[in-house]
Amino acid sequence: NATRTPDFDDSWNLIDPHSKLVVKTVSARALWVKILQNRMETGEPYLMFEDAVNNDLPDFQKRKGLKVHHSNLCSEITLATDEERTAVCCLSSVNLEYYDEWKDHGSFIPDLIRMLDNVLTYFIDNAPSQLERAKFSAQRERSVGLGAMGFHAYLQKNDIPFESGLAGGINMEMFSHIKYNADQTTRYLAIEKGACPDDDTASVRNRSEER
């Protein structure tokens, strides 16, 4: 491995994203070690691999030449940005501790997706001119995100070991249930209210629910 040889030059330029000028040159290896050490000690920073994220962009955004350049600070949002677009977080979460109470309610996930879509509409209609790029992004892709919390509490409540095969199976069941219902809802909303303008196939209302 050439990167392990003593004479390998691992100089890494730190570039100001606005001026595009190199502001400092550091050792890539030393920087990576610092990142990993801090991650182990504090749980931060969250790491995002740009190539992997862009490979997973919806095809209709790839066709427009859009790219993800960064995430939000918590790394749960990976949306395309450029000179016209500023990413907008429109999020909600389900509480998995009570999964058994809501999983059989057919309108539970659909109502949440519809609520998030309504929040986007309110933002688009009422955002001030200073947020024009955020408004444009929200209007074009209508991205929403439905996350989850409380998985550990569900396992504790039901005396299920965290690293057990049963826990893994339950995890798969929960998130498959959420994704299926969310995907179905955004496709239904595309028929009812119209697809997001970015989607040239006119199949989805909300970009984040399409993969």
Label for each model-derived stretch:
Residues 1-42:
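Polar, glycine-rich mid-to-C-terminal structural blocks
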Residues 141-148:
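Aromatic-lined, polymer-binding surfaces characteristic
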Residues 34, 150-154, 170:
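A general alpha-helix detector
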Residues 28-35, 40, 50-74, 188-209:
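Conserved mixed alpha/beta core segments that line enzyme active sites in large multi-domain catalysts
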Residues 20-25, 97-106, 130-131, 155-173:
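Inter-helical turn/loop segments and adjacent helix faces that build the functional surface
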Residues 111-135, 158-209:
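Internal maturation/activation junctions in enzymes
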Residues 25, 29, 85, 106, ...:
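Electropositive phosphate-/nucleotide-binding environments in soluble metabolic enzymes
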Residues 39-138, 150-154:
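Function-dense linear segments that define catalytic or interfacial modules
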